[in-house]
Design a protein with these regions (language model features):
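Extracytoplasmic/secreted proteins, especially bacterial periplasmic and envelope-associated proteins
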Residues: 1-8, 30-34, 38-41, 79-83, ...
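Sec-exported extracytoplasmic/periplasmic mature domains
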Residues: 7-14, 37-41, 89-94, 161-165
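C-terminal catalytic histidine-bearing segment of alpha/beta-hydrolase fold enzymes
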Residues: 94-166
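Short beta-strand/loop motif that positions the catalytic acidic residue
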Residues: 67-70
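Gly/Ser-rich "nucleophile elbow"/oxyanion-hole loop immediately N-terminal to the catalytic nucleophile
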Residues: 1-27
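Acidic catalytic loop of the alpha/beta-hydrolase fold
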Residues: 72-78
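Short, aromatic/basic amphipathic alpha-helical patches
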Residues: 82-90
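Primarily recognizes the serine-hydrolase "nucleophile elbow" in alpha/beta-hydrolase
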Residues: 18-63
């Protein structure tokens, strides 16, 4: 249904088919991963946040452009991230990875993003250090708290929207 809606919108409006993007967090991120598996040539780039999927069908991601952001203390998403990294490295992908605290000042996080982008990889992985996404005095799961931090990374958003299909 979502893909039919996308096709209808692209068909109706003046939208550049070379600049379609997907992003999602948790189950929405899982859908973005699935869309990239099922339709490998649809998106110019993707942003996956706090999600995972069976990486055995992700070998073609070696040609994709994406950021994948998780919290280290998330119970599932880092496992999916590591599985995808393993698949990509088996295909000699030049992946870029970084880890930092989500409690760093935003300017420092943006500098970390720029350092990661400067590595020139198509596949970029960011991990927020365990315990850093849960605000002081709050409880809950790192999975849920990681989303806001991921989407506050302006450099990641800017990178995403600079991408176009080649």
């Amino acid at each position: 249904m979502t893909l039919r809606l996308l096709e209808a919108i692209v068909g109706k409006y003046n939208i550049d088919r070379n600049r379609l993007y997907t992003t999602g967090q948790s189950m929405g991120g899982m859908m973005s991963l699935y869309f990239n598996i099922a339709h490998p040539d649809l998106f110019a780039a993707s942003l996956f946040v706090g999600c995972q999927w069976d990486a055995t069908n992700m070998g073609h991601f070696v040609d994709d452009k994406f950021f994948y952001v998780v919290a280290a203390g998330d119970k599932k998403a880092p496992i999916g991230m590591e599985a995808l990294k393993k698949v990509l490295l088996a295909k000699d992908a030049n992946i870029a990875t970084a880890e930092w605290s989500a409690r760093l000042p935003q300017a420092e996080q943006e500098a970390q993003v720029q350092d990661l982008i400067a590595k020139g990889s198509r596949q970029n992985f960011v991990v927020f250090t365990e315990g850093s996404v849960i605000p002081e005095g709050k409880g809950g799961m790192e999975h849920m708290w990681s989303f806001d931090y991921a989407y506050k990374l302006e450099g990641v958003r800017d990178w995403l929207f600079r991408q176009a299909k080649e």
